[in-house]
A protein has these predicted regions:
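Accessory, non-ATPase domains that flank or precede helicase/AAA+ motor cores in DNA-metabolism machines
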Residues: 1-384, 390-441, 453-469, 752, ...
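Short amphipathic alpha-helical segments
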Residues: 15, 235, 724-726, 772-774
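Solvent-exposed, membrane-proximal periplasmic/extracellular interface segments of envelope transport
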Residues: 39, 56-62, 66-72, 644, ...
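Glycine-centered secondary-structure boundary/capping sites
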Residues: 91, 103, 153, 168, ...
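Inter-lobe coupling/hinge segments of SF2-like helicase ATPases
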Residues: 277-283, 287-290, 299-739, 747, ...
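Short secondary-structure junctions
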Residues: 591-594, 749-757, 802-807
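A carboxyl-terminal module marker
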Residues: 747, 751-772, 811
Length: 818
């Protein structure tokens, strides 16, 4: 009897598609395996098998699958359940979830672009088909799969591509900016035997070459070669630094056959783990918090740990992790920002060693695929540390989920679908496994705070800072008055300059916070007021001095800064506003001797860049760190005594009902970076709104007063946590047609939802990538059945798209928008 499979395609399709199984693989296919399938006229995709059955569909002609890619499933049953929940709750398709969930190396398709890996060395003979593909790529190193299929004359080419990808002979489009070459480190060892007698002979030989002798002696010291059975491995970089000699001295010893240099792989998955240490004992306050969390988990599945900045929440997490993995269960530890993984990784590896796996988008795709496959086996990592995409990984027996800095809006995926919130998704995922979830932060989101206070979540507080470090002193500075008196130096108040100077003189560090990247948010012609706008989007372009270009932060469009105004030919083009790049420039003028680094999206596009900025600041190589909100997110530095918040008003004046909450969180978090064990930190908060209630609440660290004020307003105006929000976005290239379609859809929604519907209106940015945008807001009572609301929304969307006039309408939803 003929077998069929229902598959999920990596496309926004509302249903599964059915394919027939050829007899040769009919018994091998399992739910969760990948298959290559034809779709459309000439395209092939990697699909995931959802069901295996014997029922042929009647509405379309069934095609055979082209190939089976897996001998065993790459998706577990709980993951399918999780995908279904995400698609249903966030009003998207399982195809959308599939595209977001899997590393690109696991979802090849006809349009995938592949590139030859120049570092590839075959460890086994290539098949004739594999060699043919590599021959074609050696002529043109970047080609799409469709073109390779045409030129090679092969059928089922995706199986060959998969094989070459597994062998790392090629890499796929998403990874073209990264290298697959394993990260290696040059190390030094003695050539030949290393006994005491030979060392004495070498010392005699080098007696007339003092620098070479000093290098050899330093190697003996670093490696511990005389006191150990197995000498410690010594890196070339460390040896040269500690001996204080140039590479030519080492090269001389290599030529004399005394030393040899070899390369050791230090990639993430093969990273040499230092000796594992015992857990640190918790102090009295941490222990009490730990015990209260454990007690809370007896009754509730979710617990909020509200701990002030620098209270030692991570140490509490580590003890809970250790107890969970001792029970044979796995832990998922979520962070809002890739930058944070660098610091936390070191702390966790010291305790858990190779039981820890790290997963995020800055890793090459091959490494992410490797972690995914490892998690499917019996010997998966006990702990996964990662950012929001880590919720998609397979787990055999998840016991605990930790969501650190749970209030951060970076946990929310903005584009494309699924527009999920990783914190909320993680809570649901944990429930599916019967696991517990711990939410940790110094400044909880108002929704989480409300859930904790009304008893839905457990609630534990940790009010004392670790080792009695004092909370910083926050000093507000009225820059409106200083600007009026012309006492500002660029963007810096005299007080901030004085404090920075004192800190640098005392060898302390400074963090400056400005939540806008680039050099200037806007360029303006002083003569006629012309402002350069993006040709694709309804926004002004940001000037980036480093590349001397104007850039759109929405679509990436760039063009050179004109020498004169194209409207009036005036030559006075002036900067309006300031970003991190401008601050960096100004600081280098004010403090030319200081080592300055900038941490924003432009300077941290690679994993290595993140790590270097953080490591240099930790080691005291950087004196002043300038950054966007990245610097506010839980990073711990011992020598920061001054934090400058350069312009609080940009946060307070943002047109969003959450702006006051976010402003408080950002300012409180960045302020928490200041302070040392024996010295109280200082925060200079520059603002033109010196009497604003939020400014006073930040100064007094009065979180609860801020929350009470915001809750009263939100209840009055029907916002979360009292109401749920769904934003309905409509897009089209034709603005007039879009206006008409948006009005019709809003009317249809009002017939069902009544006055819960607001709009349609233009969002703050009303055109992106040549598409005009309209937004309809839906406010639904917290206790209303959301499942029914979702059904009605999808029914109305279907009605719209079935109307011939509205075929070109693009509709998508943002559920629980941030």
């Amino acid at each position: 009897m003929k077998k069929y499979v229902d598959v999920i395609l990596p496309l926004p399709l509302p249903k599964y598609f059915t394919y027939s199984l050829p007899d040769e693989c009919a018994e091998e296919v399992e739910i969760g395996c990948r298959v290559i399938v034809p779709f459309g006229r000439k395209k092939f995709y990697t699909a995931i098998v959802r069901n295996v059955h014997y029922c042929a569909p009647t509405e379309y002609e069934v095609k055979d699958i082209s190939a089976l890619l897996d001998a065993s499933p790459i998706l577990l049953s709980t993951q399918f359940k999780f995908w279904e929940w995400l698609a249903d709750y966030y009003l998207c398709t399982q195809g959308d979830v599939y595209k977001a969930a899997l590393p690109s190396g696991l979802k090849l398709e006809s349009e995938t672009i592949v590139e030859y890996n120049p570092d590839f060395e075959a460890d086994a003979p290539l098949s004739e088909r594999e060699q043919r593909i590599l021959d074609l790529l050696s002529v043109d190193s970047q080609q799409c799969v469709t073109k390779l299929e045409k030129e090679s004359g092969m059928k089922n080419i995706l199986t060959v591509i998969k094989s070459l990808l597994d062998r790392e002979a090629i890499f796929v489009k998403e990874e073209l900016r990264r290298t697959y070459k394993p990260k290696t480190e040059a190390r030094v060892r003695l050539a030949g035997s290393a006994d005491e007698k030979r060392l004495h002979i070498l010392f005699d030989i080098l007696s007339r070459a003092p620098k070479q002798l000093a290098l050899l002696m330093k190697y003996v010291e670093c490696s511990g070669i005389l006191g150990r059975e197995t000498p410690k491995e010594v890196s070339k970089k460390e040896l040269l630094q500690r001996a204080g000699v140039s590479p030519s001295i080492l090269n001389g010893l290599v030529e004399k056959k005394i030393f040899e240099i070899y390369f050791h792989e230090v990639g993430r998955l093969n990273q040499e783990v230092k000796e594992v240490v015992e857990l640190n004992a918790l102090n009295e306050f941490q222990q009490r918090a730990h015990d209260e969390i454990v007690q809370s988990f007896q009754e509730k599945n979710v617990c909020l740990l509200h701990g002030v900045t620098s209270s030692g929440k991570t140490e509490v997490y580590i003890h809970l992790i250790e107890e969970t993995i001792r029970q044979g269960k796995q832990v998922l530890y979520l962070l809002p920002e890739i930058a944070l993984t660098t610091q936390i990784t070191e702390r966790l590896q010291r305790v858990f060693g190779s039981r820890l796996g790290i997963y995020h988008s800055k890793f090459p795709d091959a490494e992410r695929v490797e972690i995914w496959r490892k998690q499917l086996g019996e010997k998966g990592y006990d702990i996964i540390l990662g950012v929001r995409s880590s919720v998609f990984l397979p787990f055999r027996d998840l016991g605990l989920v930790i969501v650190d800095e749970e209030h951060e809006n970076t946990y929310k995926q903005q584009d494309p679908a699924p527009r999920y919130h990783a914190r909320n998704a993680a809570i649901v995922l944990a429930a599916m496994y019967g696991a517990k979830t711990l939410l940790g932060t110094a400044t909880p989101s108002i929704e989480t705070w409300q859930n904790a206070r009304n008893g839905k979540y457990g609630f534990v507080q940790l009010k004392e800072r670790y080792k009695e470090i004092q909370l910083p002193e926050i000093i507000p500075v009225d820059i409106k008055e200083l600007h009026r008196k012309r006492r500002m130096v660029g963007q810096f108040s005299p007080l901030l300059i004085q404090y920075m100077k004192e800190a640098l003189e005392q060898k302390e560090q400074v963090i400056l916070f400005q939540n806008r990247r680039g050099f200037a948010p806007m360029i303006e012609c002083r003569t006629c007021g012309w402002v350069p706008k993006c040709k694709n989007c309804d926004v002004s372009l940001t000037y980036h001095k480093g590349i001397n270009q104007l850039t759109c932060h929405y679509c990436g469009y760039t063009y050179q800064l004109p020498k004169s105004c194209p409207a009036c030919e005036g030559t006075e083009l002036v900067n309006r506003g300031f970003g991190t790049e401008k601050i960096e420039d100004d600081i280098k003028v004010l403090f030319p001797e200081a080592a300055v680094a900038r941490m924003d999206l432009d300077t941290t596009r690679t994993r290595a860049a993140y790590e270097k900025i953080i490591a240099d600041f930790e080691q005291g190589k950087t004196d002043i760190l300038i950054g966007t909100q990245m610097v506010s997110k839980g990073l711990d530095f011992d020598h920061v005594s001054i934090v400058g918040i350069l312009n609080a008003d940009t946060m307070l004046n943002y047109p969003d009902f959450r702006s006051y909450e976010r402003a408080f969180q950002l300012m409180a978090q960045v302020a928490g970076r200041a302070g040392r064990k024996n010295k109280r930190g200082r925060v200079v908060l520059q603002t033109k709104s010196i009497d604003h209630p939020i400014i006073h609440q930040v100064i007094g660290n009065n979180y609860e007063e801020m929350v009470d004020g915001q809750l009263a307003e939100r209840q009055m105006f029907h916002y979360p946590p009292y109401y749920r929000l769904v934003y309905v976005y409509l897009k089209n290239h034709n603005e007039a047609l879009l206006d008409q379609m948006a009005a019709v859809m809003a009317d249809k929604l009002r017939t069902v939802f009544g006055n819960r519907v607001l709009g349609p209106d233009k969002p703050p940015v009303a055109r992106i990538q040549t598409l005009f945008i309209k937004k309809i807001v839906l406010k639904i009572e917290q206790n209303a059945p959301m499942g029914r609301a979702r059904e009605l929304l999808q029914r109305i969307q279907k009605e719209m798209l079935e109307d011939e006039r509205y075929k070109s309408l693009v509709v998508y939803y943002d559920v629980d928008p941030m």
